[in-house]
Amino acid sequence: MMTAEVTAADAEVLLAQPRGFCAGVDRAIDIVERALELHGAPIYVRHEIVHNRYVVEDLRGKGAVFIDELDQAPAGAIVVFSAHGVSQAVRGEAEARGLRVFDATCPLVTKVHIEVARMRAAGREIVMIGHKGHPEVEGTLGQAQGGMYLVETVEDVAALQVSDPGNLAYVTQTTLSVDDAAAVAGALKARFPGIVEPKKSDICYATQNRQDAVKLLAPECDLVLVVGSTNSSNSNRLREVAERKGVAAYLIDGAHAIDPAWLQGRRSIGITAGASAPEVLVQQVVERVRELGAVSVRTMPGLEESVAFPLPKGLSRKIAQTESLE
């Protein structure tokens, strides 16, 4: 049992709104759970379905097997692609090995993949703004055979060498800092004035909304706790947004990770959660902060999200067929 040491005596807890799960994460988790219900364990999932330890362990307990590469799944197995998306090479490998695929790629990531295909078909080279090594970035870069460049910072733009400066377009990772992405996009436009931008921002609605919510939350607090795993891009960006507002901020996987010393003397403690972090973890954090002395909890004003994405058609058909037999 956790210590009941009091370090946040009489503090107020402020909850960001919105926070936590987005529509793409809800859909991805639902796909794995529905696949398990229809076909039973094991269901193989390429990479973590979403970047959250609690979610992954919960699904593992239900029979999901998380793999790094497709060759770890037996031929003919059922495989779910994670919400981050995959390259065309991975899709080809799955088909060649006779794997039965349920695609949990977030529809907003798929939108970027379609943009890449359209831009390359028009003969343009593409600059992607994103974090090297992130699964979403690897999947998006893998939509084209060459002709793509990756930049992360304004300095990367200054050093960028392209084959055809007059025939460029750019896309972005969906979970970037809105402000950082705007700065890098601005640098691209300044260096390559004719560069074609996406028709609509590639940064997803949930990333934008959660960052905006932290910008409202942080000035009201002297500490912000961000619930999310360390490998979650959007959760890390929330911590950075709070810090840029001059507030101490910590990224935590859950209540167990709270150091009581962080709360010493704090009068107002903000709590938010990345788009892959479930609300149950937020409530556990709230309860832990109450144990440490907080006396009230208030939700900040903010957007009420109503976005929902449908399940893949193939999975929806199977569910409908099963239900019709019951």
UniProtKB/Swiss-Prot annotation:
Binding of (2E)-4-hydroxy-3-methylbut-2-enyl diphosphate, residues: 51, 84, 134, 174, 232-234, 276
Per its UniProt record, what InterPro entries does this chain match?
LytB/IspH (IPR003451)
Can you name the source organism? Bordetella parapertussis (strain 12822 / ATCC BAA-587 / NCTC 13253)
| Name of the protein described by the UniProt record | 4-hydroxy-3-methylbut-2-enyl diphosphate reductase
- Return the EC number: 1.17.7.4
Q: Where is the active site?
A: 136
Q: In which pathway does it act?
A: Isoprenoid biosynthesis; dimethylallyl diphosphate biosynthesis; dimethylallyl diphosphate from (2E)-4-hydroxy-3-methylbutenyl diphosphate: step 1/1; Isoprenoid biosynthesis; isopentenyl diphosphate biosynthesis via DXP pathway; isopentenyl diphosphate from 1-deoxy-D-xylulose 5-phosphate: step 6/6
Function in brief? Catalyzes the conversion of 1-hydroxy-2-methyl-2-(E)-butenyl 4-diphosphate (HMBPP) into a mixture of isopentenyl diphosphate (IPP) and dimethylallyl diphosphate (DMAPP). Acts in the terminal step of the DOXP/MEP pathway for isoprenoid precursor biosynthesis.
| Any one GO molecular function term | 4-hydroxy-3-methylbut-2-enyl diphosphate reductase activity
Which family would the database say this protein is a member of? Belongs to the IspH family.
* Gene this chain is encoded by: ispH
Kindly list the biological process annotations in GO that this record carries: dimethylallyl diphosphate biosynthetic process; isopentenyl diphosphate biosynthetic process, methylerythritol 4-phosphate pathway; terpenoid biosynthetic process
Residues bound to [4Fe-4S] cluster are 22, 106, 204
